[in-house]
């Protein structure tokens, strides 16, 4: 999960200029990418939201071309990339292993606004359905997205040899 400072460094490494507090006239505009400049609204008051907006505008700079202000498909593509880059299924599992159970705890641990986490859950529900499993080095986890978000570690069952095979092996 990239930090805000890490995203700033990445933008600079890509030759982009970031204006961190731009006075947009519309309160609806949180960030904008034009040519080699990313501007973030001065009205963004939390680092979590600033991180999300910068990552999305950086994604636009890397993957979009032309004017996409009225292109909801490109906006959704950038948003989906953002969900995976800033949180991802493994990020949700790490937060669960750190003790998070409520949505506000997940948002705080993952350094994203709760509204972003809600959008992420809706996106993952649309992409993965109500349940998906993820294998990590800490085990296999089931993530359910409906009716509420839950993470559960799956305990593998032991393989018990069948009686017929055991007798056959003993005879050899």
Model-derived segments and spans:
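Active-site hotspot residues in diverse enzymes, especially metal/ion-binding acidic/histidine motifs
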Residues: 1-172
């Amino acid at each position: 999960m990239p930090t805000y400072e890490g995203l700033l460094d990445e933008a600079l490494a890509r030759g982009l200029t970031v204006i961190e507090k731009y006075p947009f006239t519309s309160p609806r505009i949180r960030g904008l990418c034009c040519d080699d400049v990313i501007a973030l609204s001065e009205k963004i008051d939390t680092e979590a939201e600033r991180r999300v907006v910068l990552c999305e505008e950086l994604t636009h700079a890397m993957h979009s071309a032309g004017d996409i202000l009225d292109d909801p498909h490109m906006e959704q593509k950038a948003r989906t990339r953002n969900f995976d880059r800033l949180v991802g299924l493994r990020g949700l599992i790490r937060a669960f292993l750190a003790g998070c159970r409520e949505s506000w705890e997940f948002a705080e641990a993952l350094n994203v606004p709760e509204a972003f986490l809600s959008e992420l859950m809706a996106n993952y529900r649309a992409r993965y359905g109500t349940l998906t499993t993820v294998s990590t080095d800490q085990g296999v986890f089931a993530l359910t997205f409906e009716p509420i978000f839950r993470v559960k570690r799956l305990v593998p069952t032991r393989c018990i040899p069948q009686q017929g095979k055991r007798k056959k092996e003993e005879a050899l």
